[in-house]
Amino acid sequence: GDWIKNSRDGLTICDATSAAFAMDIDWSKLDVGTFSWQKSLGGEAGHGMIIFSPRAVDRIKTYSPNWPIPKLFQLKKNNEINLDIFSGSTINTPSMICVEDFLDVLNWTKEIGGLEELIRRSKDNLNTIKDWVLSSNWVDFLCEDHKNLSNTSICLKLIDHKLITKSQQTKNMI
């Protein structure tokens, strides 16, 4: 549905870490979006991206909080928006191996058909797990309403009474 209105006040902020590269995201509805490289694309953990809409940039320009902001999160310099971070300057120096890994996976993504193919593969993976769960008599989805199943955060539960009563150590091995 259209639950994020175009004529809204305030900013819409989305942590898209699980959804980026695996689900359709209407980026036009978001003012701030974040994701980590490794969640859906693999690679090195600990690196993230932040995307600002023009509305978010305007908010940064016009709002100064009354509390101190850690240097890593300061988006202003000398009371002006710090445009350096939008033109290639990094806030914190990432490993160049990690950057190269990310560029390599983006090139691979392009070769296999782009974002549409990544989303298709993610949905196919969920369908494979659905088929397996349906054929199983010892496991089910934790999410009981299958309309709410996610192709990026799959949680399963044991349903076989013999398995449920096993020790935690045994369950961990399953």
Regions found by a protein language model. Name each.
Residues 22-40, 45-48:
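Internal gly/pro-rich beta-alpha loop/helix module
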Residues 38-127:
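Active-site C-terminal subdomain of aminotransferase-like
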Residues 127-134:
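Active-site rim loops that border cofactor/substrate pockets in soluble metabolic enzymes
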